[in-house]
Amino acid sequence: MERLFCVPCGYGTTDPLTYPGPWRHCQQQNWPQNMGAPIFLARLRVPANVSQSCMNPYNRAQLQAVSTQMDPNLSLWLRSVHTTEVGVQVSLRVDKSVQCSQGSQTLHSSSLSDRTSSRKPTEAWEVGRRALIRRPQDGEDEESQEELTGPTEASQLLLPTWSRDREEQFPRLKELGEEYAHSPQDRKGKQFLELKYGYFHCKDCKRRWESAYVWCISGTNKVYFKQLCNKCQKSFNPYRVEEIQCQTCLRVCCSCSPKKRHIDVRRPHRQELCGHCKDKKFSCSVFFSLK
C-alpha cells in the first residue's frame, strides 16, 4: 500500500515512514500496487531552497498551512525564516487576499489557469469573524485601506453597486426622504390612528349605540373614517366615541368583582358586547334599538 501525496503548489514531497525500507520487494505481484502510505502516516520533506520560496508571502502562507497540518512543530521552524506573520483568507467568489502587518494586499495565484483567465476586478467585501476587510482594486493606495472592526464602523460600509446605480437613476429619492423625515415637529401636525371600543355618538340626533373596534385619532375620541348614523343617515366625520368603562373604577379593563346582571334572553347582545351580529346577514341594530 503505497501512493503519492502531492502538496499544493509543489512544496516538498511526502514519503512513508518506512522509506526506504525493504518491504517493497516482499509484495506479491498480483496485488494492486499503490504508491505510498496513508496520508496520516506520511511525513513532509522540505526542499533545501525553502528559504527562497518563503520570501513570497503567498507561497509562504500556503507552505505554513500545509506544514501545520502535517507537523505542528514544523511551523515553529518556518517562522524563524521570516518574522512577518501572514494569514490567508480564501473565498470562492473573489481572489485570495492576505492581511499582514503591512496592510491588506491582493495576491493573484501563480497557476496557469488564473494567468490566462482575464476578468474585470470586482469590488467585494470579505466578511470575517472579527473584521470586515475590503479588497483593494488594482492601482489603489494600500495605505487608504482601513480595517472595520466595530459595529459603528461597519455601518459605514459603501452601498452595493446596484444601489449606487439606483441612486443615480433616482436622484430625488434622497431629497424626498429628508423632506418626509419624521421629526418631533412634524409628528405634532400629523394624525395617527388607534383602535378603541366604545359607544358611537351622533351630534345631530343625540343618539348613542354600541360599536365594535373603530379607528380613532390617537389621543382623542374622534372616529377617523366616515360612517352613517342609523337614525339621521348623515355622514358626519368624525364621530365621537365614548369608551365603555367600569362604573366602579372608571377603567376600560378593570379587575373588579363581577356583579350579577339582568340579561334579557331575547336581546343578549345588548348586555354582552361580544359581537353576536358579526358575519351575519343583518346586524343587531336592524332588529333592536340600542338607545
Curated annotation (Swiss-Prot):
Zn finger intervals (3CxxC-type): 195-280
Localization per record: Cytoplasm, Cytoplasmic ribonucleoprotein granule
A Pfam match: Zn_ribbon_3CxxC
Domain of life: Eukaryota
Disruption phenotype annotation: No visible phenotype: mice are viable and females are fertile. Mice lacking Zar1 and Zar1l oocytes display delayed meiotic resumption and polar body-1 emission and a higher incidence of abnormal meiotic spindle formation and chromosome aneuploidy. The grown oocytes of Zar1 and Zar1l mutant mice contain decreased levels of many maternal mRNAs and display a reduced level of protein synthesis.
Biased composition, class Basic and acidic residues, residue ranges: 116-129
GO terms of molecular function: mRNA 3'-UTR binding; zinc ion binding
TM helices/strands, residue ranges: none
Tissue spec. comment: Expressed in oocytes and zygotes. Predominantly expressed in maturing oocytes before maternal-to-zygotic transition (MZT). Less abundant than Zar1.
Annotated segments matching region Disordered: 103-152
InterPro entries: Zar1, ZAR1/RTP1-5-like_Znf-3CxxC
GO annotations of cellular component type: cytoplasm; cytoplasmic ribonucleoprotein granule; intracellular membraneless organelle
Bias kind Low complexity: ranges: 106-115
Keywords: Cytoplasm, Developmental protein, Differentiation, Metal-binding, Oogenesis, RNA-binding, Zinc, Zinc-finger
GO biological process terms, semicolon-separated: negative regulation of translation; oocyte maturation
Subunit (UniProt): Interacts with YBX2.
Description of its domains: Disordered region at the N-terminus undergoes liquid-liquid phase separation (LLPS) for the formation of membraneless compartments that store maternal mRNAs in oocytes. The 3CxxC-type mediates binding to the 3'-UTR of mRNAs.
Family affiliation: Belongs to the ZAR1 family.
Function of the molecule: mRNA-binding protein required for maternal mRNA storage, translation and degradation during oocyte maturation. Probably promotes formation of some phase-separated membraneless compartment that stores maternal mRNAs in oocytes: acts by undergoing liquid-liquid phase separation upon binding to maternal mRNAs. Binds to the 3'-UTR of maternal mRNAs, inhibiting their translation.
Protein name stated in the entry: Protein ZAR1-like
Source organism of the structure: Mus musculus (Mouse)
Encoding gene (name): Zar1l
